[in-house]
Amino acid sequence: MGVTAVLMLPLLLLGISGLLFIYQEVSRLWSKSVVQNKVVVITDAISGLGKECARVFHTGGARLVLCGKNWERLQSLYDALISVADPSKTFTPKLVLLDLSDISCVQDVAKEVLDCYGCVDILINNASVKVKGPAHKISLELDKKIMDANYFGPIILTKALLPDMISRRTGQIVLVNNIQGKLGIPFRTAYAASKHAALGFFDCLRAEVEEYDVVVSTVSPTFIRSYHVDPGQGNWEASIWKFFFRKLTYGTHPVDVAEEVMRTVRRKKQEVFLANPIPKAAVYIRTLFPELFFAVVACGVKEKLSVPEEG
């Protein structure tokens, strides 16, 4: 019996591997069928995540409208997509200059976006501006700039494109948000405020447009890290709070987030929290045991401030 079990084990592993491969292939083909011929707008397409979303949706056969505030980088992304694409299975992306922090021009850009294909099926609100520092040292002008880029800009664009979705009774709006839309992390007051505001808006919008068959989705990773950068080491890393804060701030790779955005579109998920167990636990602790959460965070800040910076 033992010999039989040993002989069966490789076959079992092979069978499981085969099933996983089939599942992945079916999921990949399903993803393509879901977005094929769909008009997909991606804001801040020149960011790390924006590029990966562009790659995933372009490969899936979507009609892309790529938005960004730097024309040269948009053109570079365009060239990269075209160079590896099968022209018989993909569409040539449209490029649109858009700086969401300049809210005075968003309405006009929304019209330009609609003019590309006449409609929008999927809007991926990806643009984001970050700032870090003590609250009393961040100017009101910078606070406003962060709110314009992370809140007012995306909602102006969404409101401009939404009537078309409602009239056609179809569409999906995806907000790429952040864990800081659910809890605040010290020294990121302006950023956290903008992310809380954005999440609140799209949570409300979800209920409002459900009757029109318009789906509103939010994808909230911890942080979206750059391709080759790992969390930095410093003196503070030796403190007893390093585990909590490093796990809370250690980001997700852009490729992983882009694939999750595609799954969110494919499955029409309403909310996705893309994080390892430590940040997830922090959100639950913040909700169920707020005083404990505040105490831990405050102690961590005191510990950080008591350790001199390197260099």
Curated annotation (Swiss-Prot):
Matches recorded under Pfam families: adh_short
Q: Which InterPro entries does this entry report, sorted A to Z?
A: NAD(P)-bd_dom_sf, Sc_DH/Rdtase_CS, SDR_fam, SDR_family_member_7C
* Record has Cell division as a keyword: no
What does the record list as GO biological process? Answer: D-glucose import; intracellular calcium ion homeostasis; regulation of release of sequestered calcium ion into cytosol by sarcoplasmic reticulum
EC code: 1.1.1.105
Q: What does the record give as the active site?
A: Y191 (proton acceptor)
Single GO molecular function: oxidoreductase activity, acting on the CH-OH group of donors, NAD or NADP as acceptor
**Major subcellular location class:** membrane
The GO cellular component terms are: longitudinal sarcoplasmic reticulum; sarcoplasmic reticulum membrane
As its record notes, the protein acts as a catalyst of:
all-trans-retinol + NAD(+) = all-trans-retinal + NADH + H(+)
Where does the chain bind NAD(+)?
Answer: S47, L49, Y191, K195, S226
Q: Spell out the subcellular localization from the entry.
A: Sarcoplasmic reticulum membrane
Q: Which UniProt keywords apply?
A: Membrane, NAD, NADP, Oxidoreductase, Sarcoplasmic reticulum, Signal
The UniProt entry, under SUPFAM superfamilies, shows: NAD(P)-binding Rossmann-fold domains
Respond yes or no to whether keyword Disulfide bond is given for this record: no
Question: Where does the record locate the signal sequence feature?
Answer: 1-18
Purpose: NADH-dependent oxidoreductase which catalyzes the oxidation of all-trans-retinol to all-trans-retinal. Plays a role in the regulation of cardiac and skeletal muscle metabolic functions. Maintains Ca(2+) intracellular homeostasis by repressing Ca(2+) release from the sarcoplasmic reticulum (SR) in myotubes, possibly through local alternations in NAD/NADH or retinol/retinal. Also plays a role in Ca(2+) homeostasis by controlling Ca(2+) overload in the cytosol and the SR in myotubes.
The record's note on its domains: The N-terminus region encompasses a short hydrophobic sequence bound to the sarcoplasmic reticulum membrane, whereas the C-terminus catalytic domain faces the myoplasm.
Would you identify the family this protein belongs to, as annotated?
Answer: Belongs to the short-chain dehydrogenases/reductases (SDR) family.
- Name of this protein: Dehydrogenase/reductase SDR family member 7C
